From Swiss-Prot:
Name used for this protein in its record: Probable cytosol aminopeptidase
Source species: Wigglesworthia glossinidia brevipalpis
Bound cofactor: record note: Binds 2 manganese ions per subunit.
Keyword Hydrolase carried by entry: yes
Keyword Zinc-finger: no
An example Gene Ontology CC term for this record: cytoplasm
One Pfam family from the record: Peptidase_M17_N
One term of GO molecular function: manganese ion binding
Amino acid sequence: MKFSIADKSIKQTKDILLILGIFYKDCYQKTLKYISDENKKNIIQVVKNIKIKDNIGSTYFISNTNKVGSNPILLIMLGSKVNINSRIYKKLIINTISSIKNIKYKKSIFFLLNLNFNNSNLYWKIRRSIEYIYESLYEFNNFKSKTKSYKIYMKEIMFYIHDENEIKQANIAISHSVSISKGIIITKNLGNMPSNFCDPHYLSHQSYILKDKYSEKISVEIMDHKKIKNIGMNAYLHVSKGSSKNPYLSIIKYNENKFNGKSPIILIGKGLTFDSGGISIKPSNNMDEMKFDMCGAAAVLGVMHAISELNLNLYVIGILACCENMVDSSSYKPGDIIKTLSGKTVEVINTDAEGRLVLCDVITYVKRFNPRIVIDIATLTGACVIALGHHYTGLISNCDELSENILNASNITEDLAWRLPLNKKFSKQLKSRFADISNISDRSGSAITAGCFLYEFAKEYKWAHLDIAGTAWKSGVYKQATGRPVSLLTQLLINYGDKKI
């Protein structure tokens, strides 16, 4: 799907579908002033026979009358409220796309930008529209032998901008939303793949696809089991001991040559392509969803795609920490003590608290890059789901400024996050009788204590931890990866790159 700005003269072309919203009573007159008299007549004639007061989101198609100034029209019923929220706007977009699938026109002009929702400016109206459109069109049927596929005839949606002074802002919105949406699709596709296809080797080596596409901006290094061992990342290796699949660490550098010697922003993604829990095995119920335990790494890859396409003026390193946590005679065990890359020792109380063991070594490893900021993204704790549900990503940080920047990006993108406390009182729960620290505490505040564990290895950085256990995928009938928090993180980097809107 292509998105562009409509030339004012193009709306008279009869082969172009007009998409516009109609309010109850006289409110629709404002929308109609931008279209031809013939189209106004056609709409008014149809609206007289429609009860639209409480029928928000319903669509009506008006075919072309072949008269001069006549277009095919898709009417979207907006009800009686002039101000709508983003939830209703999303419903309007979804219903619009559903209707477009059955209409055989290749181009359309989109007039819904005149709506007032959440006091959004033009940039956010366009960005929300495109992101909702991509979400509506997304399907993952890669492994079905037979699918009910559909053909969408629409190839281009043009946004009608009546103020020429806003065209530059509109084009920026298109660029941002398309790039972010493509990054989200990459993240979703990887998350939705089964672990017998998307194993540590497959996931880590997806970074080469990015390198091939953006060879001037991207460099990639992939460490295998031997390199990881030689560096001394013992905690990382212990997690993978029970799997026949070797671990890999993929390091993706964006704009390294341009910012030679400068400090990068570092994103670390947990990439457990399957997590059985190890010896502390998980319950069988919903264990299939543990293929989603790599969504942190998938999100980092999606963000790196998005910023490469946007050509942000930043130095960013994305790291995919890929391995499996399986049950075997060689698996690491409760009671084991592991010396991490930092030199600290960890007593393993529960092998299902494996993500923090992988991440602690990677957080230590990135010290060599002298990072400006370090953010880790992980499906880390079920406790975060209990605390924040499936709406908010958990945020823990040692830096108020970084937290505020993340929360600002989360609020404006509606990819929501909520800050949890970082406090020594929680850290005391991680004390070990036999090692420097335990890998898990008691159940109280365990989403926070998981963050406190990671902080033990991140004290030298401006650091933030995003726990996406509740937001990375949906369960039940609509089970699939969500692509979060690609939108949040890309917006954060857009803001850091001085392209803030």
